[in-house]
Amino acid sequence: MEFLMSKHEADAPHLLIVEARFYDDLADALLDGAKAALDEAGATYDVVTVPGALEIPATISFALDGADNGGTEYDGFVALGTVIRGETYHFDIVSNESCRALTDLSVEESIAIGNGILTVENEEQAWVRARREDKDKGGFAARAALTMIGLRKKFGA
């Protein structure tokens, strides 16, 4: 997939990566992909860790509130985590609600968010999506955030 923003157009955007570390090894792989994509684009970033995917939207909201109160302003956000289906309905709740909350934040606050929260049936599927040499969803989420930053600037939002 081709993204719409070159390194020059970005003017060194500053992003916040919010990673859920429920599965540490998978989190490392997703973060590695996201960092590599942002480094390649010349972007800067901070990383904050949260317990699980449901905490990611709230953390982004905290960052937005903090910026309003003189804290760090971010041009965009990258959400990373893994939700693997188990034996209960919990998978559906976490998957649906984390995605819905990220979409709501993106639309209501007019912010750029790359969603790299994997929602998979098993660990094998997660690894295929997390590894840089495979689907590199961490890198994809970072590049998506950069694209949305570019579009936001293009439209003057």
UniProtKB/Swiss-Prot annotation:
Any one GO MF annotation of this record: 6,7-dimethyl-8-ribityllumazine synthase activity
Q: Which GO terms describe its cellular component?
A: cytosol; riboflavin synthase complex
Record's keyword annotation contains Plastid: no
Q: What induces it?
A: The two ribH genes may be differentially expressed during the Brucella infection cycle. Brucella would use RibH1 for flavin biosynthesis during the extracellular phase and RibH2 during intracellular growth.
Q: Which residues bind (2S)-2-hydroxy-3-oxobutyl phosphate?
A: 87-88, 129
Q: Which PANTHER family has this protein been placed in?
A: 6,7-DIMETHYL-8-RIBITYLLUMAZINE SYNTHASE, 6,7-DIMETHYL-8-RIBITYLLUMAZINE SYNTHASE DMRL SYNTHASE LUMAZINE SYNTHASE
Q: What does this protein do?
A: Catalyzes the formation of 6,7-dimethyl-8-ribityllumazine by condensation of 5-amino-6-(D-ribitylamino)uracil with 3,4-dihydroxy-2-butanone 4-phosphate. This is the penultimate step in the biosynthesis of riboflavin.
EC number(s)?
2.5.1.78
Q: Which family does it belong to?
A: Belongs to the DMRL synthase family.
Keywords for the protein's UniProt record, in alphabetical order: Riboflavin biosynthesis, Transferase
Its pathway, per UniProt, is:
Cofactor biosynthesis; riboflavin biosynthesis; riboflavin from 2-hydroxy-3-oxobutyl phosphate and 5-amino-6-(D-ribitylamino)uracil: step 1/2
The answer to whether UniProt assigns keyword Transferase to this entry is: yes
A single BP term in Gene Ontology: riboflavin biosynthetic process
Record field: catalytic activity? (2S)-2-hydroxy-3-oxobutyl phosphate + 5-amino-6-(D-ribitylamino)uracil = 6,7-dimethyl-8-(1-D-ribityl)lumazine + phosphate + 2 H2O + H(+)
Q: How does it assemble?
A: Homopentamer.
The main enzyme category here is transferase
**Listed name of the protein:** 6,7-dimethyl-8-ribityllumazine synthase 1
Q: Where does 5-amino-6-(D-ribitylamino)uracil bind?
A: 22, 53-55, 82-84, 115
Lineage: superkingdom: Bacteria
What Gene3D superfamilies does the entry give?
Lumazine/riboflavin synthase
Q: What is the lineage of its organism?
A: Bacteria, Pseudomonadati, Pseudomonadota, Alphaproteobacteria, Hyphomicrobiales
